[in-house]
Amino acid sequence: MPFQSSGHSARRGGDGRLTDALDPQDQGPQDACGVFGVWAPGEDVAKLTYFGLYALQHRGQESAGIAVSNGRQILVYKDMGLVSQVFDETTLDSLKGHLAIGHSRYSTTGASTWHNAQPTFRPTPDGSIALGHNGNLINTHELREAVAALPGPEGELDLAQRPGETSTNDTSLVTALMAHHPDQGLEERALEVLPMLRGAFCFVWMNEDTLYAARDPQGIRPLVLGRLDRGWVVASEDAALKTIGASVVREVEPGEMLVIDENGLRSHHFAEPEPKGCVFEYVYLARPDATIAARSVHQARVEMGRQLAREFPVEADLVMPVPESGTPAAAGYAEESGIPFGQGFVKNAYVGRTFIQPSQTLRQLGLRLKLNALEHMVRGKRLVVVDDSIVRGNTQRAQIRMLREAGALEVHVRISSPLLDVEEIAASVGADSLGYISLDGMIESTGQQRSALCTACFTGEYPVELPDESLLGKHLLEATLSSPTMVRALPVLNNP
């Protein structure tokens, strides 16, 4: 079983058996994961964490893990797959304790393997530490040097040779730095380590008796604090808090670290806040029932649809979404345009999000498995098809082909996020017209000030200075390092 409690870790090999062999292609966790932590003596913290991760499953579908402490030792269980596939009743019943953290992973560039599953685990001078991370650190080169400079065994061992760690795993580097505190407590050590980090991060971590959480000074990823009758909870989104019956207290502030133990809740600010929340949380990443910076994600997406209708009107008979991510924006487009709203696709609920799957082969296979056109709804009609984004164009191309095969007269695609590359994408999807919301329109729909948002995916303007690419330690931002220019256009395409 994929348990971990002593710092030694194993993973499943190609034959399904557990192996200690390292995959040299492994890379660290990326930016769209889900993290959860709970401190609640007397509660079943493993099951609370399980349900919290279940509510955050949309943020990552490749692996899941839970670490639990009973006050004497930390036990970590993690494996590849969905939360419901990794954990069963027997496993959860074996994870007894008063505090826990959990993680669900999505990798954008790294290999999808057991070694990159979280939480990470590490022994310390006075116990152990387990840590979960949502984000990207861009100074891994500096962090690796800092780990190598640690005195004692930490500095003598090559990170690449340690089971469970690779030279590009930023989370393992942070865990190693946190764990080295021979002359101070973990709380004090964390306040030294966190200012060393550059990039986007939301951490939850724990030792045997204390839960910790921290958010980067820009607040790029969301992190929320909640209250239980007998404890505290932190999670990537408030929807996870509501799922387990916790009340929402507030967002963890940018540059803030929380400490939760038997003495209650303590807050430390390790850096001045410079809010730059990721705008793509509003577009796609977050659940529609989440609230970020006091703005309903669902309301933001509906407003994006209204804005799309104002920017790119078209004569049509039906506005239809690409379910489920395009539904709020499609409803907004229909409301603003006066064109009837309807469902033109039926979705197979048992197929994962195609954007989340790591393999291109799986993505292409998933397109036909995921959606089918409702012929009686689309035949003989001019359609406005609303979705939240175009990443590679594969999804939209297959969808448009299905709609035309079902008898659609025209297919007009409307996207509720700005354009990345008009030449590469628009020329290949096969729509009668293609319209993207403007950058200003998207920002206005979020209800946030432009200065408080990170729009680097669309503008190439990052809230933190990027180092030389050769020092990143991994290709963290392979899709956006070229700083694409956002182009607002409505190209008219020929029918295929």
Map each language-model feature to its residues.
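Extended, hydrophobic alpha-helical segments in both membrane/secreted and soluble proteins
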Residues: 319, 326-333, 337, 341, ...
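Short, glycine/charge-rich flexible loops or terminal/linker lids adjacent to PRPP-binding catalytic cores
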Residues: 338-383, 394, 420
